[in-house]
Amino acid sequence: RNPDEMYYRESDGWYRREVLDTLDALEANGAVMEINTGGLARGKCHDMYPSEWIVAEARKRNIPLQINSDAHHPEGIDSYYGAAAERARRSGYTVQRVLLGGEWRDVPLDIPAELGMPPEGSSAR
């Protein structure tokens, strides 16, 4: 957490370099990056993370993406899924990486019902 940029500014050159180096490492190792909505859902943050510019940079590198609510209770499992999917779409993503039946698959962002999630808007948080 970095409320109101208390500790650093994401626009600072050193921070941007660290983020880009980290994304390069994710790409080199075939790792998946997540959009995490947990802090937003629990009221601890004003936004999901990572920031939109980071998601866009990940897309440029074709880093697989996963949306994660970091839910601590079942009722929060889909918290802000629609907003996270929209952030991913704006950056050019059309799928997210999901573990289904013991294997990783790329699943379209616009069909959360396939994942057993309610239709968009039915459990607005």
Question: What are the residue ranges of the model-derived segments?
Answer:
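Short, basic/glycine-rich phosphate-binding loops at helix/coil junctions
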Residues: 1-3
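Charged catalytic cores and adjacent phosphate/nucleic-acid-binding surfaces used
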Residues: 6-125
